[in-house]
């Protein structure tokens, strides 16, 4: 039995030392120290020994059991430490790697179009003029040759706040304010007026109660219709392509005389006629004309000495035509599926 205990101890310690994981180690514990293990069988055989041998062999058997228990416990600590270290190693975060960049917004399609036009006009020597969105009736209408009860006021159903104040229906009041305070000793007036405007329109695919306008104004000595045509030609070719042709049609606006509307040759069909141009080969873009003498005089400008031209267009219409947007409401519904299609490389201010 002594030899049996020593062989068992050596065999068990060897296998315990070679155990590579906790499951194997637990299997060895059950194998050698379990109820059906060899140590249990040896302890059962103690009763067959003589009274002299029994204490000695019992003490030796207990020493072997204690040694194996301690060996298993020691090996368990080693394997648990190795498992923890391996887990920490596999879950280590490399702080030198670049982090996940946050989602950064880019400029909205409408902002891109507005800034493209602003950059073009600034390059032509224009300045940007701004004014209040809550405007006096005088600047919104009367200073623009639209006196009270003028029938043309019916064309712009307005949001009145008080009897004499309203949400501006156009950015033309900025032109009136600019002319009123301008000092011609410092040069001619040459401004564009971008901004939000408001009209009591029913929202649909092509109309909105709030939209944007960019209006332009040039006033100085010897300003002619040819200057207006040249400016509109540059605008059309810059925004819609060098191959674009323009067409000017007579029209009526109370604040300009003569007044014209500008069409551009259809960029979809090349003038042959299609759904975009409604079969005409031309697409209406903006209204314009020479500043009416009455408007100049109401701003304190001598109409016999100074002349000028003005024009106005909607960036929404430009964006819809240029990027084939079929509903103006897409520009205002904040649907990321739509806006992500027109992401610019330049980030916006958030």
Swiss-Prot record:
Record InterPro entries: aa-tRNA-synth_II (IPR006195), aa-tRNA-synth_II/BPL/LPL (IPR045864), Phe-tRNA-synth_IIc_asu (IPR004529), Phe-tRNA_ligase_II_N (IPR004188), Phe_tRNA_ligase_alpha1_bac (IPR022911), Phenylalanyl-tRNA_Synthase (IPR002319), tRNA-bd_arm (IPR010978)
Catalytic activity: tRNA(Phe) + L-phenylalanine + ATP = L-phenylalanyl-tRNA(Phe) + AMP + diphosphate + H(+)
EC number: 6.1.1.20
SUPFAM superfamilies per record: Class II aaRS and biotin synthetases, tRNA-binding arm
Magnesium as UniProt keyword: yes
Annotated Gene3D superfamilies: Bira Bifunctional Protein, Domain 2 (3.30.930.10)
Pfam family, one: Phe_tRNA-synt_N
Keyword list, A-Z: Aminoacyl-tRNA synthetase, ATP-binding, Cytoplasm, Ligase, Magnesium, Metal-binding, Nucleotide-binding, Protein biosynthesis
GO-annotated biological processes: phenylalanyl-tRNA aminoacylation
A Gene Ontology molecular function term of the record: magnesium ion binding
Keyword presence, ATP-binding: yes
UniProt main location, coarse: cytoplasm
Record localization: Cytoplasm
The protein's assembly and partners: Tetramer of two alpha and two beta subunits.
Family: Belongs to the class-II aminoacyl-tRNA synthetase family. Phe-tRNA synthetase alpha subunit type 1 subfamily.
Full protein name: Phenylalanine--tRNA ligase alpha subunit
Lineage of the organism: Bacteria, Bacillati, Bacillota, Bacilli, Bacillales
